């Protein structure tokens, strides 16, 4: 099987890169092992939410993105943003904003500055882009609605309205609000309640999407809101897009917002579904449930890869993109004495002091502090080409969280790195 580009990994980075290449006429295949991290994400994308802390103290929140991305080069020279340069990072971020608008991902935000989004526990987290159905505030501006009702679903334990309501008013942007909490009684979900394992956001949305009792649900929301101007709901309404949520908003005449629940997350799944539909509609091929095993090299180039399901057939391509993610997606593997990338056996780097073969450098003694192993990943250059045995391979690129040299959890930049490197690599391949 021969392609122009073979992409390993079907998450945010892999799909974004594939779409950009397919739009320009390249023939791409994505080898997708299973659910990606985006399926468990909040739906909000972060470009850079916090600056690194050299003393493991509190990280400074980022508001002005350009200023802080530029400053990042001095503190983390191996960060993908530092290698690409602030100008290119912001340009690729803006390219993704345009792509998101084209795909109707319904995202709000800009590269000018971060906004605050409300979490499922009632705290605020910085974000670059958020679904327009999620409650957000800009800086210290007060939330525009004074009376808020936080409504859960009776018997659904992955969203706790009382806890959210109590925490919400502790934020300065919501201290003027009157926040109440309650539960929706939805009889159509009684069948799911018999098995707690099935009472999850995905199952709920699948049942409700048929709108068998849509008017009853509208009435229940209005009555439970008790005169509130805004209603916060768990993200359980609409599996593939926001149409169901929009219909509820129009019918109730209320400012309805949805909040991410415990994984799996509908907000993240919607984005992955829409990205995949776009990739396939452009003629891209998705090989689902398969995983890349190893590669064959010719000099400083990758000739082909082998996969688990296609044992007797090689996948050849002019260029290869490694978008396999970090430990969560098995893009990186840790054993007792080493951390490695399993397909190409690429060189591994991390933050200063990290050594992939010295387990004692992987962690620090305080559990809640940023851990050095979280910065592990493959080494790249300014073109995102992957390093192996000290040399950069000319037709192998890395995108997303498989890249090393930064801690995405600490800095709040995982999805930003994913889309920025994906679009940068697409440009590199198209320029050949």
UniProtKB/Swiss-Prot annotation:
Question: Record's InterPro entries?
Answer: FAD-dep_OxRdtase_2_FAD-bd, FAD-oxidoreductase_2, FAD/NAD-bd_sf, G3P_DH_GlpB_su
Specify the pathway: Polyol metabolism; glycerol degradation via glycerol kinase pathway; glycerone phosphate from sn-glycerol 3-phosphate (anaerobic route): step 1/1
Q: What is its EC number?
A: 1.1.5.3
Name any GO cellular component annotation. glycerol-3-phosphate dehydrogenase (FAD) complex
Instruction: Tell me the GO molecular function terms.
Output: glycerol-3-phosphate dehydrogenase (quinone) activity
The Gene Ontology biological process terms listed for this entry are: glycerol catabolic process
Question: Which superkingdom heads the taxonomic lineage of this protein's source?
Answer: Bacteria
Q: Does the keyword Hydrolase apply?
A: no
- Coiled-coil region: none
| Cofactor(s) needed | FMN
Q: Name one Pfam family in it.
A: FAD_binding_2
Ordered alphabetically, the record's keywords are: Flavoprotein, FMN, Oxidoreductase
Catalytic activity of the protein: a quinone + sn-glycerol 3-phosphate = dihydroxyacetone phosphate + a quinol
Q: How does it assemble?
A: Composed of a catalytic GlpA/B dimer and of membrane bound GlpC.
Q: What does this protein do?
A: Conversion of glycerol 3-phosphate to dihydroxyacetone. Uses fumarate or nitrate as electron acceptor.
Tell me the protein family, please: Belongs to the anaerobic G-3-P dehydrogenase subunit B family.
Name this protein carries in UniProt: Anaerobic glycerol-3-phosphate dehydrogenase subunit B
What species does this protein belong to?
Haemophilus influenzae (strain 86-028NP)
């Amino acid at each position: 099987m021969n392609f122009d580009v073979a992409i390993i990994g079907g998450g945010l980075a892999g799909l974004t890169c594939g779409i950009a290449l397919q739009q320009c006429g390249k023939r791409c295949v994505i080898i997708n092992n299973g659910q990606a991290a985006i399926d468990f994400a909040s739906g909000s994308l972060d470009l850079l939410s916090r600056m690194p802390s050299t003393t493991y103290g509190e990280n400074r929140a980022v508001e002005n993105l350009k200023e802080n991305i530029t400053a990042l080069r001095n503190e983390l020279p191996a960060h993908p943003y530092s290698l690409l340069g602030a100008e290119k990072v912001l340009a690729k971020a803006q390219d993704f904003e345009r792509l998101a608008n084209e795909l109707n991902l319904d995202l709000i935000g800009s590269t000018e500055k971060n906004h605050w989004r409300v979490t499922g526990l009632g705290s605020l987290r910085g974000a670059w882009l958020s679904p327009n159905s999620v409650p957000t505030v800009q800086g210290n501006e007060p939330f525009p609605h004074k009376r808020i009702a936080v409504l859960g679903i009776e018997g659904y334990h992955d969203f706790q309205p009382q806890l959210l309501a109590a925490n919400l008013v502790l934020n300065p942007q919501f201290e003027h609000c009157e926040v109440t909490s309650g539960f929706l009684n939805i009889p159509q979900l009684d069948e799911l309640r018999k098995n707690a394992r099935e009472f999850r956001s995905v199952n709920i949305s699948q049942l409700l999407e048929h709108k068998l009792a849509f008017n009853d649900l509208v009435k229940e929301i209005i009555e439970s809101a008790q005169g509130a101007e805004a209603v916060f709901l768990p993200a359980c309404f609409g599996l593939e897009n926001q149409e169901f949520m929009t219909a509820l908003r129009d019918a109730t005449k209320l400012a309805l917002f949805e909040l991410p629940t415990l994984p799996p997350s509908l907000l993240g799944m919607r984005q992955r579904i829409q990205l995949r539909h776009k990739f396939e509609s452009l003629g891209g091929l998705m090989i689902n449930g398969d995983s890349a095993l190893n590669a064959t090299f010719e000099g400083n180039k990758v000739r082909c890869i082998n996969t688990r399901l296609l044992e007797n057939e090689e996948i050849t391509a002019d260029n290869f993109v490694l978008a396999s993610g970090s430990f969560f997606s098995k893009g990186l593997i840790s054993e007792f004495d080493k951390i490695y990338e399993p397909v190409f056996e690429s060189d591994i780097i991390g933050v200063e002091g990290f050594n992939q073969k010295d387990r004692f450098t992987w962690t620090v003694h305080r559990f809640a502090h940023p851990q050095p192993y979280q910065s592990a990943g493959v080494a790249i250059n300014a073109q995102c080409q992957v390093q192996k045995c000290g040399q950069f391979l000319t037709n192998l690129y890395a995108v997303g969280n498989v890249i090393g040299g930064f801690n995405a959890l600490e800095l709040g930049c995982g999805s930003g790195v994913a889309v920025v490197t994906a679009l940068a690599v697409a440009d590199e391949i198209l320029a050949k």
